[in-house]
């Protein structure tokens, strides 16, 4: 009898373990996004003379003028990753009523990429909306910058660059004003990320031309954490199961931002990883879309 009871308890434990394993969320991967049918292409618009200085503009149906989401792709700032994986997100945002400007730019491995070219490209691409608004129905009083991973870093930086000193290599006069930022698994603290281990972490000194101790002034001008307060609404959407960008990147940044008077909110998704945030078919998508709407709702 005792042996039978032991056997039943063992079976119950094994069944519970298997059920728990079955209930683990299936995270979206890079391959999942790459396998999706390509959405209709946006209008390709050049913002500079280099072949990589362009963006894809998508406009909703109707007359406009439309609120604009500047989309900045990730990929560890490296040349082998381009804007294409953000096309599905851009198309979904456009279907929801937003004009999207999906930026391409020179990256590490491209001629002119890295410091300072990568930063100057995304700045130039964003500011080019001023010229584009003369031709397309864009509402430049309603601009949100949204970026993923390394693009989340650049999105936050785009909203922060107004705080740069004039002597900075990244300084641009009268940058386009943005209403806020939605950072999806964004790398908000460049210095702490550079000194941690990981393949994407190792790309930071390649982007910056050295480690924080070697080129401290560059990090001071490139890390959103060092350029606070941004004085715009910020949503940091983060998957708790992200193996590439730790949750602390979002939470530490938000704590620091709030201490300086900024409105910064972490949206933590317990069952999401790194790529769930940019997949419109994922359960994370409604919260991403809500974050964009909340930024634009602010007066």
Across the structure, where does each feature detected by a protein language model lie?
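Catalytic histidine-centered segment of alpha/beta-hydrolase-like enzymes
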Residues: 272-281
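Catalytic nucleophile-loop/oxyanion-hole region of alpha/beta-hydrolase
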Residues: 81-89, 103-142
